[in-house]
């Protein structure tokens, strides 16, 4: 600013002095410091004596002139110029001993006292500029020695002056620092170090230089900090018993160093075995005397000066010694029945070569013990702990230096290994948040330690073990899912068991083993799913390009849904040679699981092939490249495609061809003429809820490009497109497969149901046919063995019950002959043809109140009969023969009439006009009893149904049946077939009133009130014998119908009749009395019965029907009166001994079979063998 102000004043003075006498000249004088210079001034006249005047020299910036001379008086001189200035040659000023500060503007003035002109005061002055050149000189420098704490900043300032102005630079150890770098910066002669380090210490030199010379200044920077190790220790190897030295030297400021040595982080002076043999020298070296094997290890040198953290340096000491056994236990336990190990604790340096074993003082030969081997460390491995392992063992190890000797003897003991008292299950499934207790306990000698570990990731503080060693997970968390192991270990052995814990009700677990296979413009991502948490999980693949700049942390991730059940996905449309990040996310109904680890992969570029030589480049038109960057976007208007034009186009682009497909179908042309100027297209004609793939092909002239990249898009939820209405061929394969499978399953199910129904109907029809055709098979007794003791007479124990065996019967039953209507006697030589006989109305055969077949009255004969039939009187047997065409197998339990000519269950008889139904016969009443229906153990009897008051009567074929000779009266006095059986007392109706009226009345009440008749319980059908004719069926008790249609059981001793007292057939409220079947045979434990009524019972029913239909009264035998034949048969029942009883029973059966065979021999229908007859043979 001073120089600027001086120049301004000087210019003002010059401008003012320019008037009248011209412009004054400015003189510049240059001098060197220390020398002299003359500032010229020629204002005095050159010749003559000048007038009286005053000479002044002014310096710009000074208030007073620096030099004033008046006449001969002594000059007045500024103190800064005293002794250095004087006039020379008039008014010129000579300055000696120039200084740098003398540089500046000077003005010379001469005032003539005799010529005072005020306006010319400034005219007698001239300006002179003095320039003083000097070498550089430092005005400010740092101290010669500077101490700075490590890691603190420091600034070194160096300021120099001179003319010309000098340039200041900094050097460190002779190297120019320039503008500085890193932590060091140099600017305007100032050196700044932001953070002083150990390497920053040294001598810094400041140098100021110009054309007049240079000046330097040195500063030593001392960094206060911890020592620096300049000579670290080195690894050493020494034989045992030799001395070793480990060097260690450090430098530091301040230099008050203290060295410390450590072995394996323990001060060597604190180790008792090293303390008497270790020395630390002044230079920091460690001296170790008489090394031992235990001296081997890592030794660390730590120098310290008390500042901050001291450094350290380590070296490893290796001691070589022969192989030796450290500590052989006196006893070694081995687990019984498990593998075991006899260890030989060995140490050796150089490494162990081999170990020799002795057992009981003799060399051990492993080849004599199968399963024994030696491990790499020399231990004996025993495959199975048994008595062969017992003994005393000793081992001797060897290495390249030899051996230190054999080991002490160890004695092998056999002990039981730990055994689990309670093992965990293989798997546990539990809801999250609940408590899970997994038991695990073991025992052994010594007691084992039971511990739980989780394989893989562990749980911190979430798993507890109670006093019983059971694992407690409270509460159960998602992290507890996985594989757990329970181990029990002691000195004998270690055993372990494991279990898997599945935590339900959680989000999916992270997927594992994510791998990415790079493909051209794509990548194939695969993974292993984790546990789904108990719900169906779905996967999605996330990917994004890797950021090229590290400071860019935001990424736009793209996700692709994975089909259900898949564990891989192909990611298309990636840029080649660009790194992408991939991750897989699992989700279920409860939320999302964690992302998998991120995997990097770069898609490969399309393979390139070398171009074939062709025309010069000027003649080859550029090829047409495919469209670029095809993207499909879902919009409210539909699917919108965006793309970029091809990069290479030989000439004008004509257009594009849009192709598309669904799933894995073939490509179809959707739009063959897309304008070449278009870069977007709204795709029409799509179907809702379909996944489409699109691609573009460009064409220009005769050139057609390759297809562009494929763009995938789903139309799910786009209402602008119609729902699926295409042909079944366009259905997705899973849906189509499901529909076809459902239709096939339904068809197969219907077909199987039809076949099963047909088969069941055929079997039911066959079973019914066999039941109709089959009658009770005859009983054939095998020859008796040894006779039983007499004391066995009358025994009712199960041992006395006859055992039966079912066999086939070649003889047709009487029921077949009765059902088919064939005569039982000798066939007539001229039998009437079926056509001439004509149908006869049949009397319904019903079951009586006691369960037996009974007959009702004969039906009135038709009005139209042949002459022979009208003239010939009807016998009761002929009239009763019609009754065998009735059956009581109707669902309601009422008698159902059947036709004799056609009894097939498949083809029912043709409908005929209904006729008045006759009253039910005794046999049908018998069959309609509720307890008789309960006696059908085969389950074929239809259940009782509630009667309908408006139910129409069942159809009955009233055509007459041919008269059978079997039903004719015998020549001998008629004897009831029932009377031929022992113990049978039959009351025939002898009064004018037919006895069937009581039965009809009772049957009517049964039909009207079937629900009021209690059925006999099924529990009453208790079998006491293995035969079919034994007491397997409980006989009906003697009952009397009450007003409500029920029956009451008589006293146990009542065996006379069903009606109590003197009541007989003429009474309407009673029915015929029948004795218990238990008294019909000589054997009280056996009866000639079967599942269906027997032959004799049917014959007896026929006889009863004949007796009840006779017009003439017959005398009714009194109750308890027996015929001579009955008495004879009854007397046979009182035999003594099982052998006699069996012989009598055999005679009775042989007589019965002779009568039956004689009867069936006359029936033609019985000459044909029955398909599946049965016999009951007494074993």
Curated annotation (Swiss-Prot):
Q: Which biological process, per GO, is one annotated for this protein?
A: dendrite development
In this UniProt entry, the residues modified to Phosphoserine are 809
Q: Does the keyword Cytoplasm apply?
A: no
Q: What is its main location?
A: membrane
- What positions does the record give for glycosylation? 188, 256, 513, 524
Kindly report every residue range on the membrane side named Cytoplasmic.
Answer: 756-1179
Residues passing through the membrane, by range: 735-755
Q: Topology: which residues are Extracellular?
A: 21-734
Q: Where is the composition biased (Pro residues)?
A: 613-626, 826-836, 906-919
Which Cys pairs does UniProt list as disulfide-bonded? 41-108, 158-206, 248-301, 344-395, 440-486
Family membership noted in the UniProt record:
Belongs to the immunoglobulin superfamily. Turtle family.
Q: What is known of its domains?
A: The PDZ-binding motif mediates interactions with MAGI2 and SHANK1.
Name of protein:
Protein turtle homolog A
Organism of origin is Homo sapiens
Gene name in the database record: IGSF9
């Amino acid at each position: 600013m001073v120089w600027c102000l001086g120049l301004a004043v000087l210019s003002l003075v010059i401008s003012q002095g320019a008037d009248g006498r011209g412009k004054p000249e400015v003189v510049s004088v240059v001098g060197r410091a220390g020398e002299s210079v003359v500032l010229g001034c020629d204002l005095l006249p050159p010749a003559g004596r000048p007038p009286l005047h005053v000479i002044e020299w002014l310096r710009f910036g000074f208030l007073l002139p620096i030099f004033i001379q008046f006449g001969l008086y002594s000059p007045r001189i500024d103190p800064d110029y005293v002794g250095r200035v004087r006039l020379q040659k008039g008014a010129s000023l000579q300055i000696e001993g120039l200084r740098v500060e003398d540089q500046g503007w000077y003005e010379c003035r001469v005032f003539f006292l005799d010529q005072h002109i005020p306006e010319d005061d400034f005219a007698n002055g001239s300006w002179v500029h003095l320039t003083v050149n000097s070498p550089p000189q430092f005005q400010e420098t740092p101290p010669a020695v500077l101490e700075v704490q490590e890691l603190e900043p420091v600034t070194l300032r160096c300021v120099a002056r001179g003319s010309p102005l000098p340039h200041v630079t900094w050097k460190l150890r002779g190297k120019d620092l320039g503008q500085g770098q890193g932590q060091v910066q140099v600017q305007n002669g100032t050196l700044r170090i932001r953070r002083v380090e150990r390497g920053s210490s040294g001598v810094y030199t400041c140098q100021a230089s110009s054309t007049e010379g240079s000046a330097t200044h040195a500063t030593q920077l001392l960094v206060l900090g911890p020592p620096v190790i300049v000579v670290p220790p080195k690894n050493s190897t020494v034989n045992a018993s030799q001395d070793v030295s480990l060097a260690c030297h450090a430098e530091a400021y301040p230099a008050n160093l203290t060295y410390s040595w450590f072995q394996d982080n323990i001060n060597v002076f604190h180790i008792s075995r090293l303390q008497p043999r270790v020395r630390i020298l002044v230079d920091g070296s460690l001296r170790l005397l008489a090394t031992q094997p235990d001296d081997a290890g890592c030794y660390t040198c730590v120098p310290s000066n008390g500042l901050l953290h001291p450094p350290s340096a380590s070296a490893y000491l290796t001691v070589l010694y022969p192989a030796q056994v450290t500590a052989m236990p006196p006893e070694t336990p081995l687990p019984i029945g498990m593998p075991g190990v006899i260890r030989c604790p060995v140490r050796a340096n150089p490494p162990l070569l081999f170990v020799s074993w002795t057992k009981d003082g003799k060399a051990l030969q492993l080849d004599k013990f199968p399963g024994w081997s030696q491990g790499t460390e020399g231990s004996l491995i025993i495959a199975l702990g048994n008595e062969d392992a017992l003994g005393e063992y000793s081992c001797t190890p060897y290495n390249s230096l030899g051996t230190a000797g054999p080991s002490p003897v160890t004695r092998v003991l056999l002990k039981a290994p730990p055994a689990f008292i309670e093992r965990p299950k293989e798997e546990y499934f539990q809801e999250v948040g609940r408590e899970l207790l997994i038991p695990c306990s073991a025992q052994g000698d010594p007691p084992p330690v039971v511990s739980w570990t989780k394989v893989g990731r562990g749980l911190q503080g979430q798993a507890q073990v109670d006093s019983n060693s059971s694992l407690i997970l409270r509460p159960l968390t998602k992290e507890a899912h996985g594989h757990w192991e329970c181990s029990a270990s002691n000195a004998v052995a270690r055993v372990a068991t494991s279990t898997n814990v599945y935590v339900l009700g959680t989000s999916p677990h992270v997927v594992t083993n994510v791998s990415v296979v790079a493909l051209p413009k794509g990548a194939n991502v695969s993974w292993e799913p984790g546990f789904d948490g108990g719900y169906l999980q779905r996967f999605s693949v996330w990917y994004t390009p890797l950021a090229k700049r590290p400071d860019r942390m935001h990424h736009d991730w793209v996700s692709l849904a994975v089909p259900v059940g898949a564990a891989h996905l192909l990611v298309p449309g990636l840029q080649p040679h660009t790194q992408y990040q991939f991750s897989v996310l699992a989700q279920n109904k409860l939320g999302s699981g964690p992302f998998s680890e991120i995997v990097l992969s770069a898609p490969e570029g399309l393979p390139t092939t070398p171009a074939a030589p062709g025309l010069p480049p000027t003649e080859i038109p550029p090829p047409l490249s495919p469209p670029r960057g095809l993207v499909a976007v879902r919009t409210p208007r539909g699917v919108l495609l965006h793309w970029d034009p091809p990069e290479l186009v030989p000439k004008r682009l004509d257009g594009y061809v849009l192709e598309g497909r669904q799933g894995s179908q073939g490509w179809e042309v959707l739009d063959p003429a897309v304008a070449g100027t278009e870069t977007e297209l709204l795709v029409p004609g799509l179907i809702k809820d379909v996944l489409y793939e699109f691609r573009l092909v460009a064409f220009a002239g005769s050139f057609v490009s390759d297809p562009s990249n494929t763009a995938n898009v789903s139309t799910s939820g786009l209402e602008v497109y119609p729902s699926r209405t295409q042909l079944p061929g366009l259905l997705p394969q899973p849906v189509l497969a499901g529909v076809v499978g459902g239709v096939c399953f339904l068809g197969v199910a219907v077909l199987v149901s039809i076949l099963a129904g047909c088969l069941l109907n055929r079997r039911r029809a066959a079973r019914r046919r066999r039941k109709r055709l089959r009658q009770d098979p005859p009983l054939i007794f095998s020859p008796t063995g040894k006779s039983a003791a007499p004391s066995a007479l009358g025994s009712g124990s199960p041992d006395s019950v006859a055992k039966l065996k079912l066999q086939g019967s070649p003889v047709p039953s009487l029921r077949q002959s009765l059902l088919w209507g064939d005569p039982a006697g000798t066939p007539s030589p001229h039998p009437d043809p079926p056509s001439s006989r004509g149908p006869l109305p049949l009397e319904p055969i019903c079951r009586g109140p006691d369960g037996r077949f009974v007959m009702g009255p004969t039906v009135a004969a038709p009005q139209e009969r042949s002459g022979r039939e009208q003239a010939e009187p009807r016998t009761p047997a002929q009239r009763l023969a019609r009754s065998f065409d009735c059956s009581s197998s109707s669902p309601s339990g009422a008698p159902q009439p059947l036709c004799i000519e056609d009894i097939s269950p498949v083809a029912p008889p043709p409908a005929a006009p209904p006729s008045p139904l006759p009253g039910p016969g005794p046999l049908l009443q018998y069959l309609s009893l509720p307890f008789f229906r309960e006696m059908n153990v085969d389950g074929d009897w239809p259940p009782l149904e509630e009667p309908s008051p408006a139910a129409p009567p069942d159809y009955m074929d009233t055509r007459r049946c041919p008269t059978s000779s079997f039903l004719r009266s015998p020549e001998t006095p008629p004897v009831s077939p029932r009377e031929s059986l022992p113990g049978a007392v039959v009351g025939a109706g002898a009064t004018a009133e037919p006895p069937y009226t009581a039965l009809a009345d009772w049957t009517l009440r049964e039909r009207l009130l079937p629900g009021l008749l209690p059925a006999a319980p099924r529990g009453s059908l208790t079998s006491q014998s293995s035969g079919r004719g034994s007491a397997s069926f409980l006989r009906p008790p003697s009952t009397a119908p009450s007003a409500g249609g029920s029956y009451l059981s008589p006293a146990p001793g009542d065996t006379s009749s069903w009606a109590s007292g003197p009541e007989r057939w003429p009474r309407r409220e009673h029915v015929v009395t029948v004795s218990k079947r238990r008294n019909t045979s000589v054997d009280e434990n056996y009866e000639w019965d079967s599942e269906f009524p027997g032959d004799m019972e049917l014959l007896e029913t026929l006889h009863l029907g004949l007796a009840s239909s006779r017009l003439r009264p017959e005398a009714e035998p009194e109750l308890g009166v027996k015929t001579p034949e009955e008495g004879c048969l009854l007397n046979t029942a009182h035999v003594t001994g099982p052998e006699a009883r069996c012989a009598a029973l055999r005679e009775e059966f042989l007589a019965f079979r002779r009568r039956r065979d004689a009867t069936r021999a006359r029936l033609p229908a019985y000459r044909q063998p029955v398909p599946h007859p049965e016999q009951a043979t007494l074993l």
